């Protein structure tokens, strides 16, 4: 659950060369405003495609953020500084994009909820979890404005009008944002390449935050499954089985700690084949995957809880990833002619979907 304490929206109009910086925060008592901001922040906070980073010692923004967190700078003033920086940088891009800038200070109470789940039998731990404030986060989001059309009926007038200031829907993905944990300094961000004077730049991590860039949860899980599939094919194992086991290991690790260690996943899958495990670890190192990557339970469920396969005959099967580790439910066997037989067993009921 998110609790937004402050939020503000600034407008950039690159066509006219005009910027409109708000002088007051958004009214979060207004139901629609609060709903939009919360849903937008929830979308980016839980995005598995967010890359992770840490501030460089020379980061200018890190110092300013620390001053704000300590109360030395007011929220509106700090948001103006951020907006001015983005205004100057974005207008230098070869292809300018109309956008608004959302800045927010909010609390993510999911950490407290996780503590409650992990200590369900410990009354003191539960009390601590509910009393805790969760993670205090600071978000900077570029909201692309899109052209839309509205129907206007006014007396004898009946027109279709163009609206150039339409914000993206709360559930729509946005390409450019940063979320910083004000307690730990940990950064989640997403950005796309922009051409500035003919040179490609990721302005959020490289120029604004000045931070490192580690693979996202989605990227790490994808790399792990690719490595497992390649090794399964190389050593004559069934790729569908081994990849589903890898996904099950990811889901299980996220359920317990909300962190996935690629090396531990390999040890879990190839514990009886040390020669494959050694190759797996070498490939993890060569691809420079992080030792650990944060993966929330909900994200793991979406990405790894189920595994889907499709045969060359057009049959598609989706099944729980952990089913291949449970004998007597789903079996893959190779025939002498190279064909594969898939057996689904112990089924008591079939439902059309």
Show the residue positions of the predicted features.
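C-terminal structured domains
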Residues: 264-353
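Long, hydrophobic alpha/beta structural blocks
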Residues: 1-301, 305
């Amino acid at each position: 659950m998110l609790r937004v304490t402050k939020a503000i929206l600034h407008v950039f109009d690159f066509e006219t060369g005009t910027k409109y910086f708000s002088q007051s925060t958004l009214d979060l008592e207004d139901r629609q405003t609060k709903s939009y901001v919360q849903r937008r922040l929830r979308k980016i906070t839980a995005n598995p495609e967010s890359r992770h980073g840490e501030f460089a010692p020379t980061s200018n923004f890190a110092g300013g953020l620390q001053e704000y967190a300590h109360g030395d700078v007011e929220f509106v003033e700090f948001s103006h500084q951020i907006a001015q920086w983005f205004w100057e940088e974005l207008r230098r891009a070869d292809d300018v994009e109309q956008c608004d800038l959302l800045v927010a200070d909010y609390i993510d109470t999911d950490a407290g909820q996780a503590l409650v789940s992990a200590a369900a039998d410990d009354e003191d731990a539960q009390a601590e979890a509910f009393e805790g404030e969760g993670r205090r986060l600071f978000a900077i989001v570029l909201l692309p404005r899109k052209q839309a059309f509205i129907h206007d009926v006014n007396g004898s007038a009946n027109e279709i009008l163009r609206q150039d200031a339409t914000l993206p829907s709360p559930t729509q993905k946005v390409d450019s944002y940063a979320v910083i944990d004000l307690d730990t300094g940990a950064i989640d961000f997403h950005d796309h390449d922009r051409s500035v004077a003919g040179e490609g730049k990721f302005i959020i991590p490289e120029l604004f935050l000045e931070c490192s860039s580690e693979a996202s949860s989605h990227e790490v899980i994808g790399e792990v499954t690719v490595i497992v599939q390649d090794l399964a094919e190389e050593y004559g194992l069934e790729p569908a089985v081994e990849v589903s086991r890898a996904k099950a290991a990811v889901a299980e690790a996220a359920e317990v700690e909300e962190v996935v260690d690629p090396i531990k996943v390999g040890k879990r899958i190839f514990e009886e084949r040390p020669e494959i495990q050694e190759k797996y670890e070498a490939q993890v190192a060569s691809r420079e995957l992080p030792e650990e990557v944060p993966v929330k339970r909900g994200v793991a469920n979406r990405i790894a809880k189920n595994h889907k396969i499709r045969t060359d005959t057009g049959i598609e099967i989706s099944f729980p990833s952990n089913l291949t580790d449970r004998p007597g439910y789903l079996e893959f066997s190779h025939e002498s002619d190279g064909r594969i037989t898939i057996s689904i067993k112990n089924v008591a009921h079939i439902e059309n979907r």
